[in-house]
Amino acid sequence: MNFKVCSFPSRRQSIAAFVRVLMVILLTLGALVSSDVLLPQPAAAYPFWAQQNYANPREATGRIVCANCHLAAKPAEIEVPQAVLPDSVFKAVVKIPYDHSVQQVQADGSKGPLNVGAVLMLPEGFTIAPEDRIPEEMKEEVGPSYLFQPYADDKQNIVLVGPLPGDQYEEIVFPVLSPNPATNKSVAFGKYSIHLGANRGRGQIYPTGEKSNNAVYNASAAGVITAIAKADDGSAEVKIRTEDGTTIVDKIPAGPELIVSEGEEVAAGAALTNNPNVGGFGQKDTEIVLQSPNRVKGRIAFLAAITLTQILLVLKKKQVERVQAGRDDLLKAAFIAG
């Protein structure tokens, strides 16, 4: 009988294999970290930053937290039906208007098109409709389902969208499924509020509190500008000599344009650059009624009863008028004969 001898890797081979795997892991992590350091993530129209930093995107004051990073105010619009029936799919149309002829400052200081993003806070129980519930005619208007992301697993009624190319998604159609109080006891018929937050373009402040390169940069101290050093990547350093002789260096990233020159005297907080931001954030609130089908039927029956009553009254009035006219004719004939 022949036996096949199984060979096992030596200890040295095992260690070498482990080292190779470890090196691959370290190189991968290094690439990821360096990409974030060398090419920092832009303060774009990223609603998920609110998701990462706030349990609820709407503060007690009613303000949506996206406004903390997007400082300029811009309009936002939303259109929904006045009322919907339970377990039905309807459209929530969000419009994020902006001037398509302008370009924004990108993370590297170059100019590029604006992106858009939105957070739609639907009433409790309202969610994005599943693919199989969206009517065919509505599918032509609605984008891919992966565009719509829930704010959290337990907040399916709060929907995030973006960042998306503004040229294609200035108008976003949300397919919304209304709840059914017959199967969801936490929902009742009545009037509910809907809150929209929408932005176009990059933000001015990161969630960490640091400025992006899409913001105004100011003098950190009062004094005289002694030197301005511009780097090849578009960034600059502005040196300010204060009254006590101290030199302060303000660093300006690539993107904002300097509006000061050497020898100029500046006050503390004075703008050293222009405001490169062309985007902004808008908020809009509206209402929707979850209507009971029985109430609709009752209202229709009530209106039908009123209409029928009015018709009967008109017919009765005409009948009385005919009888009265006949009686008048008889009296007139009797008077003539007498």
UniProtKB/Swiss-Prot annotation:
Co-factor(s): heme
Protein name: Cytochrome f
Classification via PROSITE patterns: CYTF
Assembly and oligomerization: The 4 large subunits of the cytochrome b6-f complex are cytochrome b6, subunit IV (17 kDa polypeptide, PetD), cytochrome f and the Rieske protein, while the 4 small subunits are PetG, PetL, PetM and PetN. The complex functions as a dimer.
Subcellular location: Cellular thylakoid membrane
Entry GO MF terms: electron transfer activity; heme binding; iron ion binding
Recorded topology in the membrane: Single-pass membrane protein
Originating species: Leptolyngbya laminosa (Phormidium laminosum)
Record gene name: petA
Family under the similarity heading: Belongs to the cytochrome f family.
Positions of disulphide bridges: none
Organism ancestry: Bacteria, Bacillati, Cyanobacteriota, Cyanophyceae, Leptolyngbyales
Keywords from the UniProt entry: Electron transport, Heme, Iron, Membrane, Metal-binding, Photosynthesis, Signal, Thylakoid, Transmembrane, Transmembrane helix, Transport
Transmembrane segments: 300-316
Pfam families per UniProt: Apocytochr_F_C (PF01333), Apocytochr_F_N (PF16639)
Binding residue positions for heme: 46, 66, 69-70
CC per GO annotation: plasma membrane-derived thylakoid membrane
Keyword Heme set for record: yes
Role, per record: Component of the cytochrome b6-f complex, which mediates electron transfer between photosystem II (PSII) and photosystem I (PSI), cyclic electron flow around PSI, and state transitions.
